[in-house]
């Protein structure tokens, strides 16, 4: 099972119920439909350390070389 929610600005329907995915997230089966939605960026996985901020533009910080 996956706990997923719509990505920011997206509205995604469950293909079985035809209802919109809840903005706070829902448990869905790990099947090809939801895996494709994850890969396309239409939904995001909600983990135990949920971060609601949009991290798409956050780049890893470069480490400075010490001399």
UniProtKB/Swiss-Prot annotation:
Function per UniProt: May possibly stop tail sheath polymerization by capping the polymerizing tail sheath once it has reached its requisite length and prevent its depolymerization. Probably interacts with both the tube and sheath proteins.
Q: Which UniProt keywords apply?
A: Host cytoplasm, Late protein, Viral release from host cell, Viral tail assembly, Viral tail protein, Virion
Subcellular location field: Virion; Host cytoplasm
GO CC, sorted alphabetically, is: host cell cytoplasm; virus tail
What ranges does the record give for the region Disordered, renumbered to this chain? Answer: 45-67
Q: Biological process GO annotation list?
A: viral tail assembly
Does the keyword section mention Ion transport? Answer: no
UniProt-recorded name of the protein:
Putative sheath terminator protein
Q: What is its main location?
A: virion
Source organism: Escherichia phage Mu
Q: From which domain of life does this come?
A: Viruses
Q: Does the record's keyword annotation contain Protein transport?
A: no
| Induction of the gene | Expressed in the late phase of the viral replicative cycle. Expression of late genes is activated by the viral late transcription activator C.
